[in-house]
């Protein structure tokens, strides 16, 4: 602890050990105190990787921190991320990242592409969150997806869920676009300047990215047909004037498709400290869920059913016993826990 100054004077710093041969000096009290503080600070900390600053993921992660972080027993760190596929990699590989928000189709896609070894055993889910709508905003003069053939279309950064879904969407519909990979706010500026034909953004409506588009811009959302092939993976949805009053006429709606968002988690081995941390997070989420359903929390929380199943995913069991077949633990990442 800190030294106490005698009356009329300043506290003297403790003498430093002299350099020289011999065994290392024993840790000082201050070093031990710092180690204890470090352990205490990390004991209840859970990292949640989200998305870009203009998307819904980051707002959901911020809500998780605002509601569940009590500053003592549980701290929730909301982290900006780069999209679903990168989030899966970050959950598996980055120290301090336990949980991430990803699209429900990301796990199957990453598995098919063999992007990460052992993915199916090391990634589980806590809850299905809500459905995210596919937004395809086009410049004036373009009225259908087929008109995007051969055109420059921004599909977000590589590794993002939007890039993945856009690739699957246009491939399924047989439309060959010229994909661009700018971040979304840059793409919106380029779209307004006529440098690209359209931009694709997968996000829960209403997405903040489009809030600043002024009425009369000429930009418009393109309808996405709910073909049988697309409905094998996605859900039908729509964008209404209530969601985007500057982009959708009053009383009208634009047909589109949606994909589920999932709260993914690393499959920590039961009995480890990291498993206990996530279990505390899950308990707090269940206990405080009602607080997410009222303002100022994001309206998408009202679509969440914590008991909903996610096909193709394994649910994280907060009360799990030791698994019968142990996978290699991620404790070698040396998380400070």
List each language-model region with its residue ranges.
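Signal peptide-directed extracytoplasmic domains
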Residues: 104-141
């Amino acid at each position: 602890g800190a030294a106490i100054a005698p009356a009329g004077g300043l506290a003297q710093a403790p003498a430093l050990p002299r350099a020289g041969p011999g065994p290392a000096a024993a840790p000082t009290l201050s070093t031990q105190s710092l180690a204890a503080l470090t352990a205490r600070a990390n004991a209840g900390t859970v990292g949640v990787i989200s998305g870009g600053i203009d998307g819904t993921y980051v707002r959901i992660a911020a809500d998780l921190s605002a509601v569940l972080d009590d500053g003592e027993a549980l701290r929730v760190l909301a982290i900006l991320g780069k999209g679903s596929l990168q989030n899966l990699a970050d959950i598996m590989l980055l120290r301090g990242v336990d949980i991430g928000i990803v699209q429900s189709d990301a796990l199957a896609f990453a598995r098919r592409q063999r992007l990460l070894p052992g993915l199916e055993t090391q990634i589980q889910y806590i809850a299905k969150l809500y459905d995210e709508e596919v937004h395809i905003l086009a410049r004036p003069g373009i009225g259908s997806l087929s008109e995007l053939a051969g055109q420059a279309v921004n599909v977000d950064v590589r590794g993002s869920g939007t890039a993945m879904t856009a690739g699957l969407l246009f491939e399924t519909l047989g439309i060959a676009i010229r994909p661009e990979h700018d971040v979304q706010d840059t793409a919106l500026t380029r779209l307004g300047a006529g440098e690209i034909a359209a931009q694709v953004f997968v996000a829960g409506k209403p997405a903040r990215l489009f809030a600043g588009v002024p009425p009369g811009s000429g930009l418009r959302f393109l309808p996405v047909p709910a073909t049988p092939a697309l409905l094998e993976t996605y859900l039908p949805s729509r964008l209404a004037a209530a969601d985007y009053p500057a982009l959708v006429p009053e009383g009208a709606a634009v047909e589109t498709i949606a994909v589920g968002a999932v709260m993914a988690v690393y499959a920590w081995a039961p009995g480890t400290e990291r498993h206990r941390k996530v279990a505390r997070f899950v308990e707090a989420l269940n206990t405080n869920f009602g607080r997410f359903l009222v303002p100022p929390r994001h309206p998408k929380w009202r679509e969440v059913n914590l008991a909903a199943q996610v096909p193709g995913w394994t649910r994280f069991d907060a009360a799990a016993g030791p698994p019968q077949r142990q996978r290699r633990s991620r404790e070698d990442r040396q998380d400070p826990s």
